[in-house]
Design a protein with these regions (language model features):
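Bacterial N-terminal signal peptides that target proteins for export
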Residues: 1-7
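Short amphipathic alpha-helical "recognition" segments used for binding
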Residues: 7-8, 83
Length: 184
């Protein structure tokens, strides 16, 4: 009996080790994102989020986003920032526009850790739309496109598609988006 038990334990150990080895961290901007790191520690490694990281630094939000949270961050890519009118990003990064930049960035953050599954449940419970209150105090509305892809609508009517959901962090979750969302 002990021999069978030992073989069973060995097989379970092999199966668990194989399952863990097969799990991969999500890749964002060419780099693996680690759930043991916080939002800022992961974001600085993403080649697709250099503009966002520069903006977070300029707004003085690094300490906040390195904090305990949890936070849900809808993280626009460099391409998303490039869609803004010419000169907008450069203007926002100027010290005299720190308050406006902070307002825009905190509009991309919701308190709590909302996975894509959580958002989809809220969308279903809201008959197709979930209303999210941002850290900035404004509203975002989440809905589904093609039945599965989460789309955000901002207060100005702009839309952003979640392109990479569920990038879990030690202090929350990042959902990569393809457009910058803007508050009123």
């Amino acid at each position: 009996m002990n021999k069978k038990f030992a073989v069973l334990i060995a097989l379970v150990a092999i199966a668990v080790t194989s399952a863990v080895a097969g799990m991969k961290n999500p890749v964002v901007g060419g780099q693996e994102m680690y759930p043991s790191k916080n939002i800022v520690e992961n974001a600085v490694n993403s080649a697709d989020h250099t503009t966002l990281v520069a903006a977070v630094k300029a707004a003085g939000l690094v300490d906040t986003l390195e904090g305990a949270g949890p936070f849900t961050v809808f993280a626009p890519t460099n391409e998303a920032f490039a869609k803004l009118p010419a000169g907008t990003v450069d203007s926002l990064l100027k010290p005299e526009n720190k308050a406006t930049l902070t307002k825009v960035l905190t509009y991309h953050v919701v308190s709590g850790r909302l996975s894509a599954s959580d958002l989809k449940k809220q969308i279903k419970a809201g008959n197709g739309t979930a209303e999210l209150t941002t850290v900035e105090g404004g509203k975002l509305w989440a809905s589904l496109q093609d039945g599965n892809h989460i789309v955000l609508k901002d207060e100005k009517g702009g839309m952003a598609l979640v392109t990479i959901p569920n990038v879990f962090q030690s202090n929350g979750v990042i959902h990569v988006i393809d457009s910058v969302v803007l508050p009123n």
